[in-house]
Amino acid sequence: MRMGIRTGAQYISGLKSRKPEIWLSGRRVINVCEEPVFKQPIREIARLYDMQHDPEYQDKITHICTETGERVSNAFLVPKSREDLLARRALFEVWARATFGLMGRTPDFLNVVLTSLYSNASFLEKYNPQWAENIRAYYRYVRDNDLFLTHAIINPQNDRSKPSHEQQDTFTHLGVVRETPEGLIVRGAKMLATLAPITDEVIIYTFPGYKPGDERYAVSFAIPIDTPGLRILCREPMQDGTRPLFDHPLASRFEEMDALLVFNDVLVPWDRVFIYNNVEAANLLYPKTGIAQQPAHQTGVRGLIKLQFATEVAIRLADSIGVDVYLNVQNDLGELLQSVEAIRALLHLAEHELEVLPSGEVMPGWVPLETIRGLLPKLYPRAVEVLQIIGAGGLLMSPTGADFANPELAADMEKYYAGRIGVGGEERVRLFKLAWDLCGEAFGQRLLQYERFYTGDPIRKRAIFYNNIKRERTLVMVDEALRMPNQQEKVVNA
C-alpha cells in the first residue's frame, strides 16, 4: 500500500509498532517513545514530518510523484534541472531552519543518499544486475512509505593500522558469515549510527579502502531497525531528558543519539543486498553513484544555517552586554559574517556550475561543495571560539529558570543579571544559555566534533581535493608566465 508523505503521528506510530534492541546506560530500552532521552528528539522529527502537510510549506518541500501519483518528499526527487535542485534545496533549508542546522541526520539526508543510489544503480549492473534492481526496489519502498533511515558505514576504532581481514577477530568489523537460501548471515559491528533508536531502517554502504582479502566485508544492504540480532549500543547521553527547556533550550531539544550497531548473525534477505563479496564494486560505489556529491548539497545547506545561527547568537550576545562597540569584537563578528557569506556564495555557485550525467541527472558542482566540506570544519569551530570569547565568564554564571521563578530572588535576578539598558535579566540569561548550549555544554562539543568529522577526516579530504584538482586542471598561467621572457627576447631581437 502506497502512502506518500507521513505525518508526525504516523512516524511515532511506526516507532511504537517496533521493538528494536536498544541499550542505553547499561539497560535495555523497552519503549523508545517513553524514554526521556528520546522523547524530545522524537517530537522534533515528528514536527518535520508535519511540516510536509502544512500549507505554508507543502508545495515548497514536497511534489507529486510521476510514478505513483502520490505526494512525496523532495528528497526523493531525481534532479533533471536547476529548478529540481532548487526544489530539493528548499526542503533542506526549511528543515534545517526548523532545527537551526543542529540536527545533521534528519530524514532528508539519507533519503537523498538513497535517491542517488537509485538514479545511478546501473553502475552495479555489470557486477550483478540483481543488486541494481534491489536498490531500485528499496528506493521505491522508502519513498512510498516516507521512511526515516540511519546509516553505519565506519568500522569500530580497533586497530586502524590493519585492514578488516587482519583484525584479531574475523568479525570485529561487519562481514558475511555465510550464505543461506534466504539471504546473507552477517556478523560484526559498524558505527556511527546517528539517531538509530528513533529510525525505521538502517542502510549499510561502502566507502573506498577495501583491500584484497576484504571480500567478506565488502557488503552493502538495508534492513529494518528491529531486525532480530541487531543490537543498538547507545553512547552516553549528553542530556537525560529531564532538564528544563529554559536551562538547556538546544541540548534538551536537538540531541542526536549516536550508536554502535552490533550484528549478531543477522539475516539480510537477498532482495535487500546491494553489494556482496566484491571489493572493486565496494570501492567504486561512493565515487560512481553520486552519494559523494548530492548529499553534500544537503549538508552544505544545513552547515550554512548552523553557522549562521551561531553567528546570530554571537551578535546578540555581544549586543546584550554592550561589548560590540569594541573594535576587536567587531572584527570577530565581521569575520563570522564573512564566513557565512562565503558558504552562501559557494552554495549558489554549486547550484549554477552544474554537471549533467549521461542519465540526464543534474549534479551540483563538486568543486564548490567540496570547498564547503573543507571550510566548515574550520569555520564552525571558529564561531564557537568567538562565542566563548564574547561570553567569557558570563557563560559560567547563569542561574536557572527556578531562580527566576522564586519571588524572593526576583529583585536580585533582574538587577545583577540584566544586560545593557533595555536588556532585562531573564532575557540576557536566556541568551547566554543559548550560547552555552552551543559552545560549552557536552551537546555543543558534540556538535563541534560532528562538524569536524561528519564527512571524514578533513585533512584526508583536502588532500583528495588537491589531487583531483591537479588531475583535472593544468597550470596554464604558470606556463604562460614561464614563456614570457622568451617572447620578450624575440621582440627585442627583432
UniProtKB/Swiss-Prot annotation:
Temperature dependence (free text): Optimum temperature is 60 degrees Celsius. Active from 25 to 70 degrees Celsius.
Superkingdom: Bacteria
Annotated EC: 1.14.14.8, 1.14.14.9
Positions of FAD binding: 151-153, 157-160, 194, 457-460
Gene3D superfamilies from the UniProt entry: 4-hydroxybutyryl-coa dehydratase, domain 1 (1.10.3140.10), Butyryl-CoA Dehydrogenase, subunit A, domain 2 (2.40.110.10), Butyryl-CoA Dehydrogenase, subunit A, domain 3 (1.20.140.10)
Oxidoreductase listed as a keyword: yes
Enzyme class: oxidoreductase
pH dependence of activity: Optimum pH is 9.0. Active from pH 5 to 11.
Cysteine-cysteine disulfides: none
Family indicated by similarity: Belongs to the FADH(2)-utilizing monooxygenase family.
Function in brief: Utilizes FADH(2) supplied by NAD(P)H-dependent FAD/FMN reductase (GTNG_3158) to catalyze the hydroxylation of anthranilate producing 3-hydroxyanthranilate. Preferred substrate is anthranilate but it can also utilize 2-hydroxyphenylacetate, 4-hydroxyphenylacetate and salicylate but not kynurenine, phenol, 2-NBA, chlorobenzene, naphthalene, naphthol, toluene or ethylbenzene.
Identification of the protein by name: Anthranilate 3-monooxygenase oxygenase component
